[in-house]
């Protein structure tokens, strides 16, 4: 079997699939990407690079499409070189949206094309118009509509597609949903597991909270409104007054991963820390962490805050549940698909820092009561998101 994976990042969502398929000597697994770092045993990584990025003078609605076409064009050239070297994949599996899969049916018309569909953009009813303080206008509506162009081309071209959650599948046009299967990538429950009385000591960044009894954690790729960062900082300002022994660990980069950036190179971290003066001795910004350090943060967490607009569900929330974290999460659709209030976590209004703080205090004040919720949190992942159960099913789906 010859399999071609396509994703601008490496190994991304295809890490376990590529590794498992690469272990079989009967398979030839090739991974097309533009990320140079990293390797997987049994997988041949081949690189592509866009000739340029979208030009500034391109209409701003069309820039994402132009970038996707340029990505697809680079992958087309890569695919043609693979074809010239007699590599004709039986299966192509790529991530839709960036553009790598756009022209695969032109190079390999007989190959099965599978696409990983993470998100379909809608101006109303999900992330874009969620915040009443940041309303969208006609320009936004038009821009968002055009942003789906490369995804729509993939929906048309692919043989089948996969979406990781029910909520994410529901964002796609109804007429294409029969093509999509809901199947999560899976969480490694043998890696993400609780450790009783875990202490947080990270020598690499000189962080030692081994003597701290209350640690509230937060994890995100960036620090932005999409993942509730402004609400988090306001919540911390309330909690610092009410819990003088509590420390806060924020894992993430000082950037915007999703949504709009602020003008004049400002960051949401800088703006929020000016707005809410905090005791910086009790708040620890770690930047992004290697997996083993990130795991230690989750294992030592007293309460883990997860906030998101109605958008793509973060792997980190599921990893936190698997680790037995007590999650205080936003009562938004992607979270409610997994967490039931008072059963395997505590839900709060995304926009109400006082309520978020109150539920964090509720969790800190009732550790015995929360043990059952923590146990149920892990049970949720073991039963429904266990990588070792889902990976064989994912492989079966690919081979259909």
PLM feature segments, named:
Residues 52-62, 111-149, 190-199, 254-263:
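Acceptor-binding helix/loop patch of EC 2.4 sugar-transfer enzymes
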Residues 341-342, 346-353, 362-367:
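Conserved acidic donor-binding segment of nucleotide-sugar-dependent glycosyltransferases
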Residues 1-44, 388:
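N-terminal subdomain of nucleotide-sugar transferases
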Residues 159, 296-312, 325:
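Acidic donor-binding loop of glycosyltransferase active sites
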Residues 122, 140-213:
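Donor nucleotide-sugar binding/catalytic pocket of nucleotide-sugar-dependent glycosyltransferases
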Residues 355, 362, 369-384, 390-396:
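A short, well-ordered alpha-helix in the C-terminal region of glycosyltransferases
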Residues 255-256, 261-288, 292:
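Nucleotide-activated donor-binding/catalytic signature segment of Leloir-type glycosyltransferases, i.e.
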Residues 203-227, 233-238, 248-249:
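Conserved donor-binding/catalytic core segment of Leloir-type glycosyltransferases
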């Amino acid at each position: 079997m010859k399999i071609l994976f396509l994703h601008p990042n490496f190994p991304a969502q295809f890490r376990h699939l590529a590794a498992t398929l690469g272990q079989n000597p009967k398979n030839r697994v090739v991974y097309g990407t533009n990320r140079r770092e990293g390797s997987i045993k049994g997988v041949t990584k081949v690189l592509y690079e866009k000739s340029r990025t979208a030009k500034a003078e391109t209409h701003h609605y069309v820039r994402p499409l132009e970038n996707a076409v340029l990505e697809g064009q680079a992958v087309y050239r890569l695919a043609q070189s693979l074809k010239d070297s007699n590599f004709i994949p039986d299966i192509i599996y790529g991530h839709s949206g960036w553009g790598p899969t756009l022209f695969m049916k032109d190079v390999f018309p007989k190959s099965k094309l599978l696409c990983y569909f993470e998100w379909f953009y809608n101006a109303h009813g999900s992330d874009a118009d969620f915040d009443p303080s940041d309303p969208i206008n006609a320009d936004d509506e038009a821009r968002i509509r055009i942003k789906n162009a490369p995804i729509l081309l993939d929906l048309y071209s692919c043989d089948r597609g996969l979406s990781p959650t029910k909520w994410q599948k529901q964002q796609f046009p109804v007429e294409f949903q029969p093509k999509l299967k809901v199947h999560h990538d899976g969480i490694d429950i043998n890696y993400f597991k609780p450790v009783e009385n875990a202490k947080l000591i990270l020598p690499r960044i000189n962080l030692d909270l081994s003597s701290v009894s209350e640690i509230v954690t937060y994890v995100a790729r960036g620090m932005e409104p999409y993942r509730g960062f402004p609400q988090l900082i306001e919540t911390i300002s309330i909690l610092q007054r009410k819990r003088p022994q509590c420390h806060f660990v924020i894992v993430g980069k000082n950037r915007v991963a999703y949504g709009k950036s602020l003008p004049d190179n400002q960051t949401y971290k800088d703006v929020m820390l000016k707005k809410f003066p905090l005791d910086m001795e009790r708040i620890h910004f770690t930047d992004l962490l290697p997996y083993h350090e990130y795991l230690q943060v989750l294992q030592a967490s007293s309460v883990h805050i997860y906030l998101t607009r109605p958008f793509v569900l973060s792997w980190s929330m599921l990893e936190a549940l698997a680790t037995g974290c007590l999650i205080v999460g936003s009562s938004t659709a992607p979270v409610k698909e997994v967490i039931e209030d008072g059963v395997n976590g505590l839900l709060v209004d995304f926009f109400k820092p006082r309520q978020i703080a109150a539920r964090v205090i509720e969790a800190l004040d009732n550790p015995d009561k929360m043990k059952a919720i923590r146990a149920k949190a892990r049970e949720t992942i073991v039963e429904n998101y266990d990588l070792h159960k889902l990976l064989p099913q994912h492989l079966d789906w690919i081979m259909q």
